[in-house]
A protein has these predicted regions:
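Boundary/linker elements of alpha-helical solenoid repeat scaffolds
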Residues: 41-48, 82-92, 119-122
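EF-hand and EF-hand-like Ca2+-sensor regions
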Residues: 60-112, 125-139, 143-187
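Eukaryote-specific detector of the first structured module of a protein
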Residues: 1-62, 67-70
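N-terminal alpha-helical segment
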Residues: 6, 10, 103, 119, ...
Length: 187
């Protein structure tokens, strides 16, 4: 069962991931994110880098469908919430692996130069690509950057995702990973 805090955070994340705002998560939503990243990185329209990034962006989505035993390629918001609220789909034992996989996906997608850290600029790009209000990017970065060294490591990203996906504490630092989930609306 989801607490109200978790329901709000997960609904907010669903709205962010729903790039075309049709109320469903679909492969096109994830491909659109890849296209935006490719444009920022100025990858040629037919480059292997562009294709690799598109494949990377779809990997997590395919895994979501697999985890949900879905034959249909669309995920509705109620299905999304059920995924995270059901102890049969994501139980405490599998949550750790799931959080790592999700955090690593986002981390690798936005570590644009491959230096194994997320810089402030790369973090800002994540906000731009997902149309998240930039007003909250600085506080989000500061809260996730646990050691205040001006960069986000994979372990810091994992901790943030653990907070965001699993914590019912509205003050958890990782809740800010995608901006202010409590008052902001995904664009």
């Amino acid at each position: 069962m989801l607490t109200e805090v978790r329901r709000k955070k997960l609904s907010y994340l669903f709205d962010i991931l729903d790039a075309n705002k049709n109320g469903l998560l679909q492969p096109d939503d994830f491909a659109a994110v890849a296209e935006k990243i490719c444009n920022i990185l100025e990858f040629d329209g037919s480059s292997t880098e562009r294709l690799q990034l598109k494949l990377k962006s779809l990997r997590l989505y395919v895994q979501l469908l697999t985890d949900m035993n879905k034959e249909d390629v669309s995920i509705s918001k109620p299905e999304w919430l059920e995924l995270f609220g059901s102890r049969t789909m994501i139980n405490p034992k599998t949550a750790k692996k799931y959080i790592f996989r999700t955090a690593a996906y986002i981390f690798n997608l936005f570590d644009q130069n491959g230096d194994r850290i997320i810089s402030k600029e790369e973090y800002l790009d994540m906000f731009r690509i997902y149309n998240i209000d930039l007003e909250y990017s600085e506080i989000g970065f500061q809260k996730i950057d646990e050691n205040s060294d001006g960069q986000i490591t994979l372990s810091e990203m994992i901790a943030a995702f653990r907070d965001f996906l699993m914590s019912s504490n509205p003050e958890a630092a990782g809740n800010w990973i995608f901006g202010n989930w409590d008052t902001s609306q995904a664009a």
